[in-house]
Amino acid sequence: MGVADTARLIDSGRDVRAVPARWIDLGHVAPSSFHATYAGLAAAQTDGAPPIVVWARVAPHISLGRHQDADAELKCPLAVPVVRRPLGGGAAWIDESQHCYVLIMPLARLKGRPSEWFGWGLAPAVRTYAAFGLNVVRDGQDLSLSGRKLAGSGAATIGTCAVLGSSFLLRFPVERFAACIAAPSQAFTAWLVRALRDCLTDWESHLPAPSEEALRQAFRQALAETLGWTLVEDAVSPAEAHAIAQGCGEWEAGEQGPRARRVPYGIKVKRDVFLTERHVGDRFARVLTRSGRFEAVALSAGLPEAADVLLRACPPAFDALRRSLAGFVPREEAASWARLILETACFHSD
């Protein structure tokens, strides 16, 4: 997305190619401070305020989406802090191997629907990756490289601003993140590790990571090229600091949540991949789906490897699934197993 495309979504009342914007570098910060800062900054802005870019490296923590509950999603207590961020999306691991950024844009400057924010909001990151030779593309709210998720993002309206956050992921600790996710069995965690390795990637898996200064400068240049923002180094004002302090405890994960998983019985691995497991009495079904189809299924009744091959070709419909299972479980039980699989599986999420 170039400046001309962005102009259709951003209406500043003046030339979109010359929009002054504030760059606020927080340095290395604690998790709660990071999330409180961008939320407080957004809450303190007025309609005529310039856009803001918040840049930071954040201490290790699990960041939950605004509608997630720690007790439902995680193996609590954990050795790292848990913070429920004011943005959407699912559970994410954040640490110093990521460079986090948040774009804050007064709604008065925007034309598009919230679903369109990811187009302009992630365009600078795509341009930044390209500057280092990485062919990254946007896939909805995610950024992908060679078909694997490289970054996720979350957005929300805070005060009178659109807020969108993401990060440059240099290195991702797969096992450490998987060990934090609530699991009904050890096998679920093992499947999650394999799915994460298969579906996710990081910068260092493709190229040596750049220095923070090189990445910082490339991102600033990309913001100018894609959004037309002329960045000025700035700091939090006293009024903004007051707004930040007022909301500083608001995003702690101990706050009451929905007490249910965002994905029933499991987790969204990336945009079109879900891992779920459900136990009913002494029976269980574990299901990995990809692009609306079965990728792998395990049952307490036991399934041979040949079943996975057949199920991958099976549409997620009761009759088709029952017929496919009939060759691997007692025929009189095929219907109940088909029902359990379909009740367990997730093929899409909001």
Question: Which role does the model predict for each range below?
Answer:
Residues C76-L107:
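A glycine-rich, hydrophobic loop/mini-helix early in the fold
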Residues E96-S144:
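Contiguous, small/hydrophobic- and glycine-enriched helical/loop subdomains that border
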Residues R138-A183:
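A contiguous pocket-lining binding segment that forms or flanks enzyme active sites
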Residues V102-F118, T201-P210, S324-F328:
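Short histidine-centered catalytic/ligand-binding loop motif
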Residues W120-T128, R148-G152, Q186-F188:
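Active-site glycine-rich loop that binds ribose-phosphate moieties when present
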Residues G2-K75, R85, A155, P184-S185, ...:
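Active-site loop/lid in soluble adenylation, ligation, and acyl-transfer enzymes
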Residues A298-E333:
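Glycine-rich, small/acidic residue-mixed loop/short-helix segments
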